[in-house]
Every structure is written in C-alpha cells, then in structure tokens.
Amino acid sequence: MSCADSIAKLLVDAHFSCYFSKVCPSALDCAEPIVVVEGAFSRDSRLAEEERGSVVVTVLVVREVMADAESVALAAELAVRRADWEPYADAGSCRIVGIDTAAPAFKERDSSGRYVWAFDVTCMVVRSL
C-alpha cells in the first residue's frame, strides 16, 4: 500500500466512488474519474532505524462540466483535510504522520475535452530502514 492508495481508500470511504488509478483513463473506460498519482519520497532526516520525509500525492478530478469538476475537487480536498487519518496512516513501508493540502485549482482540459481540476496532498511520512 502507498500514500496514494491510502488517499484513494479515504476518498472511497467518503463516498467518492469513481475510478482511481495512477494514470488518467480514456473517456471510453471511465467518463469522470478521480485519479490519484504519487510522487517520489523526499527525505528530510535520517535516524538509526527510520527516515522522515514527505511524499506529494496529486489528486486529479476529471469531469465533463467545469462546475462539476470544481465542486467535486473542493469536496474531495475538504474530505481529505478533515479526515481522521489514523485508519489510513499505514501506507505499506511507511506511515503517514501528517498531511497538508493545497487548494484545488483548474489544471487543464484533457484530450477528450474533459475538465481537470487538481490538488496536492503533502504527506509527512516515517519509513523504516
């Protein structure tokens, strides 16, 4: 399990029941997905048994209508920000100890003409060595 998987599980539990994946699917496969993409681990400090750092996870909300993309992105960011993280803290080789979210913003229109809104979730993590 990864930080992206933890965030996707949280969103599913918050009733955002769209398609989650690491790449944006074709409009034929899923017309209005929420895509969760994980960035690389960035180490802040290293201790004898563990290292601490951060992982940025980008949440992309894809919708046919601009207003829908915006409202779902705002609701998803709010759900992530207000969530009790304890049930979702275990992310496989690392543990999420805190999160910070950025405000959702319009990103682009994809090749199918759908509107994409995005927000970043910075996960502060501890991972064992």
Feature map (PLM): residue ranges:
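Small/polar-rich, solvent-exposed N-terminal microdomains that initiate assembly or binding
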Residues: 1-49, 71, 83-94
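Residue-level signal for secondary-structure boundary sites
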Residues: 45, 67, 127-129
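Short, solvent-exposed beta-strand/turn "edge" segments of beta-rich domains on protein surfaces
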Residues: 46-52, 109-112
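Acidic-leaning, charged glycine-interspersed low-complexity segments
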Residues: 81-128
